[in-house]
Amino acid sequence: MKALKIALTKGRLEKDAVALLEKAGIDCSSMTDKKRKLIFHSSTQPISFILVKAVDVMTYVKHGVADIGIVGKDVLMEASKSHYEMLDLEIGKCQFCLASTPDFDPSSYRRKIIATKYPTVASKFFREKGEDVEIIKIEGSVEIAPVLGLADAIIDIVETGSTLKENGLLIYEKMYPISARLIVNKASLKQNKTQIFQLIDQLEQAIKEERIE
């Protein structure tokens, strides 16, 4: 049986994803002592794991290097769709928010400048509101953009809001809820349908148990 390759997002989401996979009966013991390794093979199941950055999960899945990926909905919303989104894993929950300094007026008709790591999401949000805005893409700490006068406001993902608060920003609008999703390569789903749907069934059961707990 061909081993399923699962691409996991490195960092905070990785820990939650591994915990959920283990709850679903997936052997993740090879990842216990990671050191600098990025590829891991289960010794008991036909499954291997790849640890990559969030945006690269989609690339590995798109090109079939990984059969399955676990990645935040924020990344999926920003990129073009080249995969099947199969399951909301209900982990890594946060929210897209519009935030700025206390003197920001969201109802102003003046053309606003919005800083964000997510220009596609920001464009969609303001297009739906019928507002014409200028969007500046920021790769680093977007929170300082309105403080330093680069932008009128920001759009970013917010979990607790503590980073915004520490930088003197307020949330003006909560936009789209975000959580981690299971994505599958289109060709892999055809070739490994039984294996993949068995994994999905196991994860769905684990998610149900998490809700009860």
UniProtKB/Swiss-Prot annotation:
Its main location: cytoplasm. Keywords: Amino-acid biosynthesis, ATP-binding, Cytoplasm, Glycosyltransferase, Histidine biosynthesis, Nucleotide-binding, Transferase. Pathway: Amino-acid biosynthesis; L-histidine biosynthesis; L-histidine from 5-phospho-alpha-D-ribose 1-diphosphate: step 1/9. Its EC number is 2.4.2.17. InterPro entries: ATP_PRibTrfase_cat (IPR013820), ATP_PRibTrfase_CS (IPR018198), ATP_PRibTrfase_HisG (IPR001348), ATP_PRibTrfase_HisG_short (IPR024893). Heteromultimer composed of HisG and HisZ subunits. Belongs to the ATP phosphoribosyltransferase family. Short subfamily. This is ATP phosphoribosyltransferase.
